[in-house]
């Protein structure tokens, strides 16, 4: 796959809408052309211990951050002219790029739920899953299909796992190799 946006969310608690950081990597013609990272004030705005242990973010990190609609608007505004995100309605548009995520079920659910939380229209974005692709591509040759394992198998050293931008960059690397 040569044109896509790799995306990753971290959440503050068990609610999929509680996105507290986003990382996104735009890939065009197989090359990274733009990255985006932002902290987000989560909704609901509380942190569970187990989430803090995963990504290291705490309430103080996002207390003054923008809420999701403003972060989303900023991310979309930073896309190069003419580029937009592929949805089921724009699947034939050559300037529409799909999302790619590792365990896309999680990230697509987070995106759908945070859109719903803020009463934003969700256009059924198209997602491709590097986790599913790795299970097919590496069938049986990897110990597991966790992001850092698959990234290493694709020649990428993921050193800051569970930082949304680092994870999105690893996902982009994987997608360029196996999708």
Where do the PLM segments sit?
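Conserved non-catalytic scaffold segment of RNase H-like nuclease domains
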Residues: 1-117, 124, 140, 144-162
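Short, glycine/acidic-enriched loop or turn micro-motifs at the edges of active sites
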Residues: 11-13, 132, 170
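Short alpha-helix boundary/capping motifs
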Residues: 79-81, 129, 139, 175-179
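Active-site catalytic pocket residues across diverse enzymes, especially alpha/beta-hydrolases
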Residues: 115-119, 178-179
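Short alpha-helix plus adjacent loop in nuclease-associated cores
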Residues: 128-144
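Generic alpha-helical structural context detector
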Residues: 132-135, 152, 173-176
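Acidic, divalent-metal-coordinating active-site segment for phosphoryl/phosphodiester hydrolysis
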Residues: 163-176
